[in-house]
Amino acid sequence: YVGSMGRSAWYDSPINDFPLAATDTYNLVEHENGNDNGQGATLEAIDSFITSGQFGIESGTSFTFIDKVVPDLSFVGSTAGSPSVEMSLLASSEPGTADNNPASEGGVNEGQVALAVDMVDEYTDQLDVRVRGRQMAIKVQSTSLGTKWQLGTPRLNMRPDGRRGR
C-alpha cells in the first residue's frame, strides 16, 4: 500500500462490473475503471511504473553492453491522442549500488555506470542506446493522462564488454 487512498468500505459483487468503495469524504468511487484518477473534480494522470530486477550476462568481472532494445509495448485501450511511456535502462557497476541518476538520496552514487532513457510510443520499433554496466534493470513508467500500456517481453541486444577495473 503506497500513497493515500482512504477507504472506509468496499463492495464487490458479480452483478457490478467494477468494485465500489466509500471514501473518507462520503463519496462512492468506482475502482478499476478507466485510465485516470477521476476521484476529484478534474481528471489526474495515474503515475504507473514497473521496474525489473537486476540482471547481467555473467557474474564476476564482466560488464554487459546493450546497444539495441525492442520495447514490446502495447497501448490498446489508451484514450490519449499519442500515448507514450518512458523506458529506462539502469546500469550499475556493483551489486547493491544505486543505479539511478542523479545519485541516490543520502550518498554518492559511485557505482553508477550509465543510464539510458527514451520515450516509447505505439510506433517505436526499436531504441538505439549505449549502456554499459555489470548489472542492468529495465524501468517503464507513464505519467500522462489517458495512457494505458501493457509491457510484453522486451528484447535486448546484449554482449560481454570487457572486465571491471579497480
Model-based region annotation:
Residues 1-166:
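Beta-sheet repeat architectures centered on beta-propellers
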